[in-house]
Amino acid sequence: MKSKLKLHGFNNLTKTLSFNIYDICYAETPEDLQAYVQYIDEEYDAERLTQILTDVVDIIGANILNIARQDYDPQGASVTILISEQPVTPTDSQIEESPGPLPDTILAHLDKSHITVHTYPEIHPVDGIATFRVDIDVSTCGVISPLKALNYLIHQFDSDIVTVDYRVRGFTRDIEGRKHFIDHEINSIQNYLSDDTREAYQMTDVNVYQENLFHTKMLLKDFELENYLFGDATRTLSAEQREQVTERLKHEMLEIFYARNMPR
């Protein structure tokens, strides 16, 4: 086993794992599209997202400092959790009756170690396709690794397409004063995915090793139309319509996966 790096002082590396997770569906009528948005908005409201992120904090071995969450009108939700490596014992200033910290102070902590999630439901105005995007950032400063949350987060959502970015910034010093710009071995985010996840997704990497920047895109391999239909579409589509909807959905998924508009 490789020996641990002996550091001089605190580990100052910032490690950030960013997800964009997409769930795609088809609904035949405008009413069903709106019903899907309403359903997904209730399914992943701020309370549910808070529970998911709280589980992430436990998985990566961190401690919660503060939670802020909000549901939005007409749809969408956000949650931000400030975290630390060690449990925080309240100081006298925190217990006594006195003015709280200024917003700038709180934001300074937010830039160090935090977990955020935002949701974005969206509807295609013509094709009957709805997308639900979840944007998640797990950013830690110190020895805590956000990579531990990778598999859990992918499996918590109906993830048809996933884009993952991981970057390490800053540096830490060893006891001899030598700078270290990364403190662990990695050549791909895929190394940290479970076997079942790797088997379920088509994946491609774009990595810039010298910049400690890693990017993986994931597209679900198996396509079962029934998993993408919502409302009346589950009962009323003819065989020909099912073929057309399948083509539309696959086209939509490829455009999101490659991040570009593609000819039909």
Swiss-Prot record:
Enzyme kind, highest EC tier: lyase
HAMAP family: AdoMetDC_2
Post-translational modification: Is synthesized initially as an inactive proenzyme. Formation of the active enzyme involves a self-maturation process in which the active site pyruvoyl group is generated from an internal serine residue via an autocatalytic post-translational modification. Two non-identical subunits are generated from the proenzyme in this reaction, and the pyruvate is formed at the N-terminus of the alpha chain, which is derived from the carboxyl end of the proenzyme.
Pathway named in the protein's UniProt entry: Amine and polyamine biosynthesis; S-adenosylmethioninamine biosynthesis; S-adenosylmethioninamine from S-adenosyl-L-methionine: step 1/1
Alphabetical list of InterPro entries matching this protein: AdoMetDC_fam_prok, S-AdoMet_deCO2ase_bac, S-AdoMet_deCO2ase_core
Gene3D superfamilies in UniProt: S-adenosylmethionine decarboxylase
Residues forming the catalytic site: S113, H118, C141
Described purpose of this protein according to its UniProt entry: Catalyzes the decarboxylation of S-adenosylmethionine to S-adenosylmethioninamine (dcAdoMet), the propylamine donor required for the synthesis of the polyamines spermine and spermidine from the diamine putrescine.
Modified residues (Pyruvic acid (Ser)): S113
Protein name according to UniProt: S-adenosylmethionine decarboxylase proenzyme
GO cellular component: cytosol
Biological processes annotated in GO: spermidine biosynthetic process
Cleavage (non-hydrolytic) (site feature) positions: K112, S113
SUPFAM superfamilies: S-adenosylmethionine decarboxylase (SSF56276)
Keyword RNA-binding found: no
Gene Ontology molecular function: any one: adenosylmethionine decarboxylase activity
EC assignment: 4.1.1.50
PANTHER family with a match to the protein in the record: S-ADENOSYLMETHIONINE DECARBOXYLASE PROENZYME (PTHR33866:SF1)
Reactions catalysed according to its record: S-adenosyl-L-methionine + H(+) = S-adenosyl 3-(methylsulfanyl)propylamine + CO2
Cofactor note: Binds 1 pyruvoyl group covalently per subunit.
Keywords: Autocatalytic cleavage, Decarboxylase, Lyase, Polyamine biosynthesis, Pyruvate, S-adenosyl-L-methionine, Schiff base, Spermidine biosynthesis, Zymogen
Similarity section: Belongs to the prokaryotic AdoMetDC family. Type 2 subfamily.
Cofactors (names): pyruvate
One Pfam entry name: AdoMet_dc
Subunit-structure text: Heterooctamer of four alpha and four beta chains arranged as a tetramer of alpha/beta heterodimers.
